[in-house]
Amino acid sequence: MALFVLCAALAGCAYPTQFKPGTPQQEVLSKLGPANTVKKLDGGGERWLYTTQPMGREAYQLQFGADGQLQTTTQVLTAGNFGAIPLGQFTQQQLLQDFGPPMEITRVWSFTGQVWTYRFWDNGIKRFAHVHVDPQGVVQKLMFIDEPLPEPRQRD
């Protein structure tokens, strides 16, 4: 996140958290560009998602009302949000809409389907959320692990 703040300060880059409620959609679009995903909401609003995956650990949902004004900005890659996924009910499409594309999609021998891996911060600790999606596109399992620390470098 510090890199994004530095970028914004030095180069005029935009970041999702800089926009205050009431900011028009067009202003957000002109500064951030197209969102990774856009979801139409009941009542005419939209929820835009901007992610820093695969290398970053943040994804922000910007919710706009039917009037096109920003209502809220929420960082969604959290242990609480992942933990709230209803297993056996949440679909791959919902996963994309709510969390954005993952860091990577892999397979493991112990599960028939795909494992979607997201990087995120959990109380200052770098973590992975492994979301297991079955062949029908339904989330069946969720695992959290700490991101491995780099090996210490050997001195010659």
Predicted regions and their residues:
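A cross-family detector of function-defining hotspots
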Residues: P21-D67, P86-D156
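Bacterial signal peptide processing site
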Residues: A14-T17
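Acidic/histidine-rich, surface-exposed loop or edge segments in extracytoplasmic proteins
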Residues: L70-G80
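Bacterial N-terminal signal peptides that target proteins for export
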Residues: M1-L3
